[in-house]
Amino acid sequence: MTQPAVYVVSDSTGETAELVTRAALSQFGQTPKFIHRFHHVDSSHMIEEIVDLVAVNNGIIVHTIVLESVREELNKTAQAFGVPIIDLFGPLLNQLEETYKIKPLSEPGRVRSMDEAYFNKVAAIEFAVENDDGRNPRGILQADYVLIGISRTSKTPLSQYLALKGLKIVNIPIVPEAQIPDELFEIDPKKIIGLKISKQKLTKIRQERLISIGLPGAGTYASNQRIDEELAIFNKLASKLNCFVLDVTNKAIEETANEILIHIGEIVDENLEL
């Protein structure tokens, strides 16, 4: 088999077409003479120039054109020039449309945008883990939003849930023995979300927690004095920061997260109006 000249054509980046082409060529034990990629092809002028070049060099065209009008024009032009052409997407899109009775979106680059969203989500999850429970106060400056609250207000699971939405979240525990990070006062208060809970619910949760680890009644963790002290510190800090505060009492993680997302959406809308 002689080394082929392959021209990859796409109305997006062309990465998919090139990857498939290289995979196919590997089955023949061949490295192509070259694979030349033409990306973001969306006009008759571009199509004619490309096909003419391929014809002169006795090459073949492999394409993943999504836009139907561009795809049809490329196929017809290649046939007119006698250029071999492989349409990777057309037959598949047509079959899927017939099978599922829905029209394709015809939006180039959707796989790439979905990949970017996936990697952003992974990065957000890693960020949440690295900045969990106040372990890295400097992360506050890089966070999209910061959750503050006393122990047992679901800061960690909420951080992970919001990270799945692609948000970079830091959570900071508010305890009497720990100094409040200076970074909290360096960011926009709109990026801070306080999580409060009723004294009765918190007492019950902490008592159940002590029982679950075999230490019922141990220490001051679930004592009225300790809980009153922590709640007072939180309320004072939230007031000083002038941040949004959400009551998580008797709420599931998903419910609280959705309320946070609604609040975040309101902030975005407000900024767009400015």
Swiss-Prot record:
Keyword Nucleotide-binding set for record: yes
GO molecular function: ADP binding; ATP binding; phosphotransferase activity, phosphate group as acceptor; protein serine/threonine kinase activity
Record EC number: 2.7.11.32, 2.7.4.27
Catalytically driven reaction(s): N(tele)-phospho-L-histidyl/L-threonyl-[pyruvate, phosphate dikinase] + ADP = N(tele)-phospho-L-histidyl/O-phospho-L-threonyl-[pyruvate, phosphate dikinase] + AMP + H(+); N(tele)-phospho-L-histidyl/O-phospho-L-threonyl-[pyruvate, phosphate dikinase] + phosphate + H(+) = N(tele)-phospho-L-histidyl/L-threonyl-[pyruvate, phosphate dikinase] + diphosphate
Pfam family, one: Kinase-PPPase
Stored InterPro entries: Kinase-pyrophosphorylase, PPDK_reg
Presence of keyword Flavoprotein: no
Binding site for ADP: G149, I150, S151, R152, T153, S154, K155, T156
UniProt entry keywords in alphabetical sequence: Kinase, Nucleotide-binding, Serine/threonine-protein kinase, Transferase
Protein's job: Bifunctional serine/threonine kinase and phosphorylase involved in the regulation of the pyruvate, phosphate dikinase (PPDK) by catalyzing its phosphorylation/dephosphorylation.
HAMAP family tied to this protein: PDRP
Family in the record: Belongs to the pyruvate, phosphate/water dikinase regulatory protein family. PDRP subfamily.
Name recorded for this polypeptide: Putative pyruvate, phosphate dikinase regulatory protein 1
Lineage: Bacteria, Bacillati, Bacillota, Bacilli, Bacillales
